[in-house]
Structures are given as structure tokens and as C-alpha cells.
Amino acid sequence: MINSRQNIVIGALLVVIGVGALGFYGMIKRQQHLEQGYLQLCADIEGVIDYKPEPQQVVERVVSNAQLWRPVQEQIDDTVVQIFSQVAEIDLLQPYKTPAQGTSSGSGFFINAEGDIITNAHVVDQAKALWIQIQSLGKRILDVHVIGVSPERDIALLRLSDESKEIIRKELGSIPFLPLGDSDVLRRSDEVMALGYPLGQQSLKSTTGVISGHENRWIQISAPINPGNSGGPLLNAHGDVVGVNSAGITKAQNVGYAIPINEVKIILPDLYTVTLLRKPFLGIVFNNATDALTDYLGNPQPGGAYVVEVVKDSTLDKAGVKRGDMLYQINTHTLDIYGEMRVPWAEDKVSLIDYVSRLSIGQEISLIIYRNGAQHEIVTKFEQMALPPISEIYPSYEPIDYEVFGGMVVMPLTINHLQLLGARAPGLAKYMDIQQRAE
């Protein structure tokens, strides 16, 4: 019995082993078949495309900021100056008092071999005496004076005295200067360098960053602008000036603002001939339009900027623009219902107000307006309008008109007064509106 049982068990084991062997053999054959099929497929593909794998090179380009900007740093010696001013600040609420005395400092840069300097208007505001220092001459004082200033644009043009020019030429051979670049080609993420003398420090400092974008007429950069840096140049990687450092935000990090150099180039010829250059004004006030308003007026869709006020004797008033008109184009640039347009020099739309900043006095402008469904084409010249009765005054460059009667000061109301009085005279706030000032 035992032998029979053993034979049965042994037989069963042989059957299991045989079945397993057959299964294993089948698996091996299938694997070989798959491998042969894969190899044949690869051979077919290789025959079709003649594929020959080659080793690929890994290209790595690492340039540090120091390497990028070192050639620029070598070109800027003595082109960036530190500006000092003796300030006499007038109190317009008490103009009869002796002006408050003080000193301030800022930065600037030479723009030609004649010793002309660009800086911010606020750097030289109410300055009674001005002088500069440059790196190679240490603390030696070089006298400068104001040729022209545009306070609303925050730009001033200075010039070395003849004696100071000779000092620099004797020591350095010539007056070094920076080339003016093209701010219209700037785009977000472009690298820039801001130069100046922050916090009144004696040594030239540089900070690097990128173009963050444009905000109104300003270039916003990630390089911080500190007090004392104002008026210094903003350079591109080629060493060209693309902006004038102007403002920083104390409660923000890595935020600075610069004036596009192309705006400076537009007004530069006028600064040589006009001491106080005011910002031109088209002479209209506009509101956002709507599709419903456009249809109601019978004007084509999409609409343009809706004119709600026209200032008397302004450029567009003389050209025939009227209240209720809809402005569709200016110099071939199409306006939307918000008064904004696409221009070649900006990635984002710019407002009509910012566009006007790029117009120069005497420049011809063409307009397309619609009035109750009828198209009108207007061609006129951009002119400096007469100042409205209530305007801002600049004591450094124009006289202050006042009289004192029995301890009472009588003088024309100005924007300066409105800013100084603020909440103490709420009834005067309406005169901040341009239309109210002109009436």
C-alpha cells in the first residue's frame, strides 16, 4: 500500500513538473519572439530614417553680474557727478519771512563734452548756489548753474562754469560724458544699472536690476532708488543712458522709478532756450465712454475718449474741439473708450495724458473726432497755452507777487497754497480741478 501511494505521489509530482516546464518553455519562446520582433522593428526604422545616434553637447553659459557690468563700470569714470545745493526755501503762506536755509545733495551726469549735466528738477529746487564734485578730483568744488528746468517732468539742465570746465580739461584732458540711448526699446526683464550717490555718500554707488515694466510715464525698475540717487543715470548693458533715476518708494522693496531718456531728448532743445519750461496741455478733460453712449451719439463702434470739458484758449479749443466730441485718433494712434492707445514704445497701452508728455511745442498733431455721428479731421500745432488764473508757481524761476496790509498777506491763489492748506481750507479743494482753475 505504501509503495502504491508513493508511486501515485511521484507520478503527480512528475505531472506538475512537466506542466511547469512546458509553461516555462512557452514563456521563454514568447520572450524570444518579442525580442526578435523588437529588433526587427528597430532595424526597419533604422533603415527608413538612417538613425545614427550621436553624443549631444551640453552648452552652458553663466555670466555673473560682475562680468556683465564690469565693461560698463570701466566707461563711466567721472561721468556721474554729485550735486550739492545751498537751498533757500520760501514759505508761500508767509512769503515776507526770511527763507529757511539748508543744503541738499543729489546726482547727475554729463551729456556732452561742453559740461552740460542732466539731473532732476527737485535736486536743484530753490537752490541759491550749486556746485558738483567728481571722483577723480576728490572734494574739489566745481561751480555749475541752471540753464533750464521742467519741474512737472522733474528734469533740469545744468552747465559747468567756464573756470570749472578748464579745471576738468586740465586734469582729465576732456570732459567725459555718457551717450544717450533709446528708452523706447526697453522691455520687461531687460537688465539695467542705476548709478548715483545715495544718502549723500561721497563714493559713487551702483545697483543693478531689471525693467519691471512701465507705470504711467515712468520706467519701473527692481533696483532701489534712495535719496541722493535722484538725477543719476539708468544705464543699459551697453553703457547707454536709458533713463534718469527719479524716485523710490520707502515702504516697498526693490522698486524704483526712472524718467525715460527719450522724454528728456524731446524737451532738451527747449531747455537750452527756456529757463522755466512748463508741461504742455492739450486742453481737454475726458471721461470713459460706453457702448451705449457711443450708440446714442450716433458714433461708430468701438468708441473713443468722450470729451466732457474744453479749456478756454487751449490748443484743442483753438482747433475747434467741443464738449461732447469723441476723440478717436491722435497722430494715427487709435484711442479706446478709456482714453488709452497702443504705441510702438510701450508693451502696454498708454493714456492720452502720458502720450502728450512726448509732444514738443510746435509739433503738428492730427486728430480724428466724431461729433454726433459725423467725422471731423483736425490738424493743428501743439502750443503752450497761457497759464490759468490758478496755477503752480516756482519761486526759484519766477517772482512771487504779494502785498502785506496791516499784517495780512494778499496774493494770488496758487496750487502751492492749495497743497499747503490741505484740509484746513476744504472749500478751496475744487480749484484742484483744471476746469475750475481756468474760470
What are these regions (language model features)?
Residues 61-71, 90-116, 140-143, 177-179, ...:
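A conserved glycine-rich beta-strand in the N-terminal activation segment of trypsin-fold
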Residues 1-48, 121, 145, 159, ...:
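C-terminal recognition in membrane/secretory proteostasis and scaffolding
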Residues 83, 129-136, 192-196, 363-371:
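Short conserved beta-strand and strand-loop elements enriched in small hydrophobics
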Residues 31-104, 116, 120-121, 129, ...:
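N-terminal activation segment of mature serine protease catalytic domains
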Residues 109, 224-244, 316-319:
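Catalytic nucleophile loop of clan PA
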Residues 112-155, 160-165, 172, 183:
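Catalytic-histidine neighborhood of serine endopeptidases
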Residues 108-110, 144-146, 211, 234, ...:
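Conserved hydrophobic positions within beta-strands
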Residues 123, 167-170, 176-216, 249-256, ...:
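Flexible, gly/ser-rich surface segments that form the specificity/activation loops bordering the active-site cleft
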